[in-house]
Amino acid sequence: MNLSLKKNQRNYKNETTTRTKIGIVGSRAYTNKKKIKDLIFDIKQKLGDKAEIVSGGQQDGADGYVKKYALELDMNYTEFPPMHYKWNMHCKLPASQYDRPYYVSNFHKRNKQIAEYSDIIVAFIQPNTESNGTRSTIKYAEQEKKLVKIIM
């Protein structure tokens, strides 16, 4: 996949970085792990340490594969799990933001955080499958004027 990425300085909550932050999201029903692995490998080859992979922290489907392959390939990796999840060492936000009561809105807040933090969003969508969370992240990214690539 050809990603036209430029070295940008981004500021998120008073943090400046020169890494290109690539949010990779997708349905829990997404099963083509080879496409995800190939994308992350291509990013590693093209950008190396200048890339940061961003995910939503789900264990199943696309998010689970993103985490697995980003860490296996020793990529910079950050995640924004929903606030009712437990904090882990890959979370961007502090531990005090996690282990909260469950609300459906936690997922939408997480999707917005991914869109705001990332420079580009790559969305893996399983054909003929509803993926409201992935669509939500795409919508927020478009509102933020971020580049969005959809892979089926």
Regions found by a protein language model. Give the residues of each.
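Charge-dense, intrinsically disordered terminal/linker segments
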Residues: 1-16
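Acidic/glycine-enriched connector segments
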Residues: 12-20, 28-152
